[in-house]
């Protein structure tokens, strides 16, 4: 059988622990037998990041700017325990954070929907994609404990020394204050990423803030989205038969719970942090969530939404059998292959991505799955497979 050819490589970012083991299995059993796989390989495993002083992460992000499509394995973001375990030179930053900053991207997370894994919300039939703004607000906030009576103010000092002051509160006793910010350029970039991705996936886009209460801060988000939509995207949305819809965040939550899904929900940083966990949990499993970083310049980085599955990795090292769900990691590869095919006009590659996704879903819907799904499925007859067995079962259906 002749293999599918590729003209341009995908940037491949290898990772850590159990997901690194699955990565190799997926390539060996599901990709390399069918594709003459071209990748620009970067080892983002923690040991190699440490050896290169994290330069490898920066290099992989810059390569994504060159080739426009990347696929990333889950990676460890070190804490104090990991610094000790891996004898690290320092506590390296989150690779995702570094890559996101270089590509100036927005993260879109969507559940993989299969029969037999039923959402908690019974009327959800289609995926709900969460787009989270990844800059500023409370995550770059400055906070202060107020010890007792006094006046707290916001002060803006212009380059010429002119001051603008706004009273926050006249304190009669102890309290707390918080200052947070955002920048128009980041909000504009977020808006364009959301509108572009909606066009890309032919889905309606919802955006929600609390502009009735936050008349300057949240209202600026609302205004920037509307201005960019009207000037750059309205006609394109009309042609695609999709719509942009703005509402208040509390109304959006109520509408989401009553909807059947099938749209992108753009959220400010904190709202996106909370709502993406709510949506993924309500759809059944974090191991069934895709994640793609989209930059307004048209760079795409695909990955699973979950971590490195540390507990299973330690079992694997002891020679014990694991039943680790590889679905989201498989879909990271299919997402990247499909986008590569789309950009290069390679229909064969796009068709293969569709075929692999169908084989994965068919395997689960026929009752063959990993332990985590077996515990929540509504299917009457279930066969629990180990990590490798599940991937081989998918290969049989390809």
Regions found by a protein language model. Name each.
Residues 2-8, 18, 22-23, 28-52, ...:
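N-terminal alpha-helical transmembrane segments of multi-pass membrane transport
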Residues 6-25, 29, 154-247:
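Glycine-rich phosphate/diphosphate-binding loop of Rossmann-like nucleotide-binding domains
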Residues 35-41, 201-209, 233-246, 341-353, ...:
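Flexible, glycine/charged-enriched surface loops at secondary-structure junctions
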Residues 47-159, 163, 270-274:
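N-terminal glycine-rich phosphate/adenylate-binding segment common to multiple enzyme folds
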Residues 49-62, 229, 233-262:
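A structured beta-alpha segment of the ubiquitous adenosine-cofactor-binding alpha/beta core
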Residues 134-135, 140-191, 198, 343-350, ...:
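Glycine-rich phosphate/pyrophosphate-binding loop and the adjoining helix
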Residues 256-355, 359-366:
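Glycine-rich phosphate/nucleotide-binding loop
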């Amino acid at each position: 059988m002749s293999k599918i050819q590729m003209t341009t490589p995908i940037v491949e970012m290898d990772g850590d622990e159990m997901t690194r083991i699955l990565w190799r299995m997926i390539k060996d059993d599901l990709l390399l037998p069918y594709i003459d796989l071209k990748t620009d390989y970067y080892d983002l495993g923690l040991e190699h990041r440490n050896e290169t002083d994290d330069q490898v992460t920066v290099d992989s992000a810059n390569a994504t700017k060159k080739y426009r499509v990347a696929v990333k394995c889950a990676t460890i973001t070190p804490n104090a325990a990991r610094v000790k375990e891996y004898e690290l030179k320092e506590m390296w930053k989150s690779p995702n954070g570094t890559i996101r900053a270089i590509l100036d991207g927005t993260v879109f997370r969507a559940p993989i929907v299969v029969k037999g894994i039923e959402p908690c919300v019974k009327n959800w039939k289609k995926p709900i994609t969460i787009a989270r703004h990844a800059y500023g607000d409370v995550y770059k906030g400055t906070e202060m404990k107020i010890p007792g009576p006094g006046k707290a103010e916001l002060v803006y000092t212009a380059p010429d020394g002119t001051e603008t002051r706004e009273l926050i509160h006249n304190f009669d006793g102890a309290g707390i204050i918080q200052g947070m910010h955002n920048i128009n350029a980041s909000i504009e970039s977020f808006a364009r990423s959301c509108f572009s991705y909606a066009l890309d996936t032919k889905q309606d886009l919802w955006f929600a803030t609390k502009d009735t209460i936050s008349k300057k801060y949240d209202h600026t988000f609302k205004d920037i989205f509307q201005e960019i939509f009207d000037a750059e995207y309205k006609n394109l949305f009309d042609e695609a038969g999709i719509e942009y819809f703005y509402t208040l965040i509390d109304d959006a939550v109520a509408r989401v719970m009553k909807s059947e899904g099938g749209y992108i929900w753009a959220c400010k940083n904190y709202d996106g942090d909370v709502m993406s966990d709510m949506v993924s949990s309500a759809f059944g499993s974090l191991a069934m969530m895709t994640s793609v970083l989209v930059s307004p310049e048209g760079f795409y980085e695909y990955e699973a939404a979950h971590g490195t599955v540390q507990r299973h990795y330690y079992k694997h090292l002891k020679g014990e059998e694991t039943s680790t769900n590889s679905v989201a990691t498989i879909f990271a590869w299919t997402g990247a292959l499909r986008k590569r095919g789309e950009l290069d006009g390679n229909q064969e590659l796009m068709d293969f991505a569709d075929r692999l996704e169908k084989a994965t879903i068919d395997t689960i819907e026929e009752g063959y799955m990993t332990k985590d799904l077996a515990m929540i499925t509504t299917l009457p007859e279930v066969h629990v497979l180990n990590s490798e067995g599940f991937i081989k079962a998918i290969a049989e259906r390809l």
